[in-house]
Amino acid sequence: MNITAEVELEILQRESFRYFIHETNPENGLVRDKTAPDWPASVAGVGMALTAYPVAIERGFIKRAAAIERVLTTLRFFWNSPQGPEPDATGYHGFYYHFLDMKTGRRAWNCELSTIDSAFFLAGALVAGEYFTEATDEEREIRYLADALYQRADWLWMQEDGSAVSMGWTPERGFLPYRWEGYDEALLLYVIGLGSPTFPLPQSSYVNWTSAYQWEHSYGYDYLYAGPMFAHQLSHIWVDFRGLQDAFMRKKGIDYFENSRRATLIQQSYAIDNPHGFSGYNAVCWGLTASDGPGPAMRQINGVKREFFDYVARGVPHGPDDGTIAPWVAVASLPFAPEIVLPTIDYFIHQIGLKAGNPYGFKSTFNPTYPCESHTAYGWISPWHFAINEGPVLLMIENYRSELIWRLMCKNPYLTQGLQRAGFSGGRLRATVP
């Protein structure tokens, strides 16, 4: 790199943290989902902000007092916000709507009460509770509210019929017809739900979730399949899965951390193979995940008719793939495979200039294949930054550098209880008495 890797990573972290400073409503702590005008807040983004403040304090990006004020504002808002079946509430049964109005904090867009986004929020609250441990009134209140918010979530209600957890609920139609079954980002959701002291999920729910797992072989690796890369990353923001194995992973002889490493290496191998012949793919230019894109559009390019998508769950190796690369998702694999991620970061920054002119580091995606007038090395680039892209960049870099979030959450008894009830053993649980 032109400057040391350590300095480059800290610059990326600082740039990503700026998102949570400038795209947050200081009156309620709500974080804008993306940088589009009049866009609502993302509950998952709030969870990442709560996780980001301890990192920012440790890195000198924000004063402790300023961070405490922001965290307290956020937790107070969510604790006191309207909970009920009304269609304009903020949440219900301790869960929260996927998107909230930035000013009022009420439900936006008739969206669903989201279990996964609520899980990310609650994980962020628990991080805050573990970090702010001083004997001041403010930090005591942070700990109290983090605990109270976590205990209020009624996971049994969201399980509904005794099988896997529902993806959500709406006042108009009740529970969504979709369940968290099969490997994805819901690994964290189940650990958090199983650890609840008030409304814990039954252990059978985790068995139901893992029963739909797909074990596959791709580019020389056996691994637990999930197409979009983010599914292999987000739970690892909060949980250090190194050495931890549930029943499924014990049979396979690996852990979820190693599985995510393999998924990262498969992403790179897929880009090198480039089976569909897209522009730009190579060993240091990869990263397919759920993201926005240049479509919807059909274009004839060099005699080939290609379809381009807007937001879609792009994935490897089965697709969909339209040549759209998400730089943030490559960065978020840093703890798993630094030997391929660091050169990729260097390429994105110094070879094709992906950060140039951006206020918050990398924008969400780019597509060198899609025809555009820029004539740059990266071709089309998304106009937007997203909270749930900026968060993993900041937080997974920190886990690589200091393991701060992992160390904080290792101390949380609810997380330990959730891991044990999911059947995990090994790793840090060896030193834990049930």
Where in the sequence are the language-model features?
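Ser/Thr/Asn(+Pro)-rich, low-complexity disordered segments
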Residues: 1-434
